[in-house]
Structures are given as structure tokens and as C-alpha cells.
Amino acid sequence: MAEINPVLVVVDVQNGFVTEHSRHVVPVIEQLVREWLEKGHDVVFTRYLNYHGSPFEKIMGWSKLKESPEIDIVDELQELSKQALAVVDKKVYTLFTEEGAELAREHGWTDMFVCGIDTEVCVLKTVVDAFERGVRAWLLTDASASHSGEPPHSAGVLVAQKMIGRQQTISVAELESHSRARKPEV
């Protein structure tokens, strides 16, 4: 079996995206990040930064997440984000900005385990972009959510299953059993 080089990508768990619909994933992600860091695996956080005149503002009329405290990673993950390999600031949906793509090339990740907010937007775009670059992308369904509620989250999971494969959308518990079946441990 080929050796794997995994990375955990935590997408946009920021104050401006954490609502009553998405807050439940914060402790799940916190525990997951702690475990990955303890095992010495790479962890990357992303942080979305909107700006004046962005397509989100001009086309969609959406002008949130421009400044603190909205853009800040939630308090529960602040210290952990400082221990991560990187926090990639982005003005687009995906991790794969110039910086994010360079990190992926430089570290040669074979498997990208993605969680965060919003499942149907930035999480989905990141797993699809990883897949299209030949990285085995995994969407962690119970460590991802939509700030708009369950229907958009479920829609994001469904679209991901069509785009990267049903078997690539797993729970954290399935990740743990997957980890025992594949080495090195993830």
C-alpha cells in the first residue's frame, strides 16, 4: 500500500460564520485538531476575508466578514490555529489560492481531510479543487456545517458525493476506523 501524507484542513470557522446552525461543529473540530496535532500531522486553517468591491459585495450584495471580530477564527480554535502549519487568508471560496496551492505542492499531501463552514460553499469548493488536483479529498460530514442550517449542509454533502465520490464523505468515527486500516495513522 502506498504511503499516505495527510492534512486536515479547517475551513472558515470564523465568528461571522458561526451561528446556532453551525456552532455544534466547533467542539468536534477542536477535538479533531488536537488529535491531529498530537500525532504530528499537518493542519491548515483557512480564513475568508471579504473586501470592498468584491464580487460577493458587487454581485451578491453580501458585505459581511470584512473586519474583526467577524473575520476572527472562533476563540475555541484560536490557540490551535497558532500551532497549525498555516492559516491561509483567502478572498475566494477555496483553500487553493496561490498560497494554499503552493503549500499543497510543497508538502505533497496525498489525502486532504476537510471540515468547517459552510459545507455547501467553501468546504465543497476545497474538496472538489483537491480532487481535481489529484489529491484524495475527504469531506468530514459531522465536522462540517452550514451557518444557514441543515438543508444547505445536506445539499453540500450530496453534491460532494457526486463530485468526489460517495465513499469520500465520512464521519469523524469513520475517519478513525479508516485511520486504523491505513498507515500511517491519521
List the model feature ranges, each with a label.
Residues 36-53:
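Von Willebrand factor
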Residues 55-59:
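Metal-dependent catalytic neighborhoods of phosphoester/phosphodiester hydrolases
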Residues 9-11:
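Short hydrophobic beta-strand that contains or immediately precedes a catalytic carboxylate
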Residues 21-36:
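…and closely analogous acidic/polar surface helices at protein-protein or active-site interfaces
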